[in-house]
UniProtKB/Swiss-Prot annotation:
Keywords (A to Z) from UniProt: Ribonucleoprotein, Ribosomal protein
Name this protein carries in UniProt: Large ribosomal subunit protein bL28
Biological process according to GO: translation
Organism: Geobacillus sp. (strain WCH70)
Top-rank taxon: Bacteria
Pfam families per the UniProt record, alphabetical: Ribosomal_L28
GO CC terms of this entry: ribonucleoprotein complex; ribosome
MF terms (GO), sorted A to Z: structural constituent of ribosome
Keyword Heme: no
HAMAP family registered for this protein in UniProt: Ribosomal_bL28
Keyword Ribonucleoprotein belongs to the record: yes
Family membership: Belongs to the bacterial ribosomal protein bL28 family.
Amino acid sequence: MAKCFVTGKKKSFGNSRSHAMNANKRTWKVNLQKVRILVDGKPKRVWVSARALKSGKVQRV
């Protein structure tokens, strides 16, 4: 899975727990969108997290 170009977020790991508290490995995936943004004055298609887009850290081209 890709990671966010702006924030560096990537999938995280942990355990899911049943009612008996048995542990099973699982992952949490980041909500990534492939968007075109300006990088060094040129448009580039990169993976950006939805949170970075909503907070205005990047502008779409």
